Design a protein with these regions (language model features):
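Short, glycine/charge-rich beta-strand/loop segments that flank catalytic centers
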Residues: 40-42, 99-110, 133, 224, ...
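Active-site beta-strand/loop segments that form the cofactor-binding cradle
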Residues: 26-50
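Residue-level signal for inorganic ion chemistry
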Residues: 39, 80, 248, 346
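C-terminal substrate-binding/cap subdomain adjacent to the FAD-binding core in PCMH-type
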Residues: 114, 133-300
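Anion (oxyanion) recognition and catalysis
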Residues: 29, 91, 209, 269, ...
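N-terminal glycine-rich flavin-associated loop
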Residues: 2-35, 59-105, 113, 117-150, ...
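Short, conserved charged micro-motifs
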Residues: 20, 84-85, 199-203, 254-262, ...
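Conserved glycine-rich FAD pyrophosphate-binding loop
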Residues: 47-53, 60, 104, 271-423
Length: 423
């Protein structure tokens, strides 16, 4: 049973199947009571704090593997299946879903889709929206609906797959998902180099755009977490408080990966990089990259020590200037950037002395906006100063249209009320 300490619920409902789940939502609709969907409990801090009393709705009973025609390279599972279980199922057939989800042993399929969580491989492999081809859900009236199907090239009906992805369970409780999957690759390798300044990092990132290689991940790292990482301690060429680490991932056949790592090594050396390395235990380091946003944030969290975690979405050229802004605010902050996609995730070393609102609204949000981006709070276990502006920032989205869609799917506003961007 997922921890629910930070939700205002009196009881948690545990339906055993999709029919029982729909009935539970219909009953809540009739009584006008709030419903809070709960998967693995790994992202319950995301969004505004829930204030409306209601009931939790556990997806723990929805764990069926509905259909897996491996030759068609699609899989249909219920929303309570964990990402680890799904990965093991696919691996047995030489396949995978390359999303890179933190805490995969707890995170559920429904939760991953609802939060639109994408890991370091998004640069080369895409995002959740690229893999969801069919979806079933229950709306705020307890009515079941579905979109897409089990065929990759299915264009029938409304695109509920993309609509529900990232909706935080506010339009419907996801009950079942169909993914298209990919083959496992023969080899995966991580190359790394140390960088002296953000200016030098920007030059290396620009060079990757014209590189003959095709990375699947481009990670720019800095801060206390990465300075103490054993796999990076052997790197030469950088020292001092401004140093960063650039980690690039390649996958494919053994021949392809060997050629790309050799080529990138030569390209980096030509740019003045000293002794780039191939990380020995790529799988272990990769797990640290994937889990970084959730370290210290797995439920239940110690509110006094769990970090404040922020996420900025920018144009890629804004990554290094935003790192500078973060370091000005909190020099020891641990930072991970999916640099090829303009995503920056920061775990602050301490709660801002000037307060969350002033640090974010007055400082970091304008820094993100300067690079056509936005800033979100992924996790703030303290719960302090969690306002719409501080959590969601100045999002440039059509709020009126989004609210109209919300009204159609959830007319009584019982699904995760008050947690998303709707005003």
């Amino acid at each position: 049973m997922a921890p629910v300490a930070n939700l205002p619920i009196k009881t948690t409902l545990s339906p055993a199947n999709q029919t029982e789940l729909a009935a539970a939502v219909a009953e809540a609709y009739a009584g006008g009571s709030a419903i809070y969907p709960i998967g693995g409990g790994t992202s319950l801090d995301f969004g505004l704090p829930a204030k409306t009393p209601g009931s939790g709705l556990s997806l723990g009973g929805l764990t069926r593997i509905v259909d897996y025609p491996a030759r068609d390279m699609t899989v249909t599972v219920e929303a309570g299946v964990t990402m680890k279980t799904l990965s093991e199922l696919l691996a047995a057939e030489g396949q995978r879903l390359p999303l890179g989800v933190p805490l995969a042993d707890k995170a559920t399929v429904g939760g991953v889709v609802a939060t639109n969580w994408n890991g370091p491989r998004r640069y080369g492999c895409g995002t959740v929206r690229d893999y969801v081809i069919g979806i079933s859900a229950v709306d705020g009236r307890g009515m079941s609906f579905k979109g897409g199907g089990r065929v990759v090239k299915n264009v029938a009906g409304y695109d509920f797959c993309k609509l529900l992805t990232g909706s935080l369970g506010t339009l419907g409780v996801i009950t079942q998902v169909t993914f298209k999957v990919r083959p496992l690759t023969e080899q995966f390798t991580l190359m790394a180099c140390a960088v002296q300044t953000t200016r030098q990092a920007e030059k290396l990132l620009a060079a990757l755009v014209t590189s003959a290689t095709t990375p699947v991940a481009i990670e720019l790292l800095c801060g206390t977490t990465w300075d103490s990482e054993p796999a990076l301690k052997t790197l030469a060429g950088a020292s001092g408080p401004e140093k960063l680490y650039l980690v690039v991932g390649f996958e494919g056949s053994a021949v392809e990966v060997e050629w790309m790592t050799g080529r990138l090594h030569d390209e980096w050396c030509a740019l003045g990089i000293e002794a780039p390395i191939t990380i020995g235990d790529a799988a272990d380091f990769w797990k640290k990259l994937v889990d970084f946003p959730a370290v210290g944030n797995a439920q239940p969290a110690d509110k006094d020590t769990a970090p404040l975690v922020l996420k900025a979405s920018l144009v890629p050229s804004g990554v290094t200037p935003f790192i500078d802004a973060l370091r000005t605010l909190d020099p020891p902050a641990s930072i991970q950037c999916h640099a090829g996609n303009g995503i920056v995730i920061a775990r602050l070393s301490a709660f801002p002395k000037e307060g969350l609102s002033r640090a974010l609204v007055g400082n970091l949000q304008p820094a993100a906006a300067a690079h056509h981006g936005s800033l979100l709070v992924l996790s703030n276990p303290s719960g302090s100063e969690m306002t719409h502006q501080s959590v969601w920032g100045g999002l440039d989205v059509p709020f009126a249209l989004m609210s109209a869609v919300k009204q159609k799917f959830d007319p009584k506003n019982i699904l995760n009320p008050g947690r998303f961007v709707y005003v």
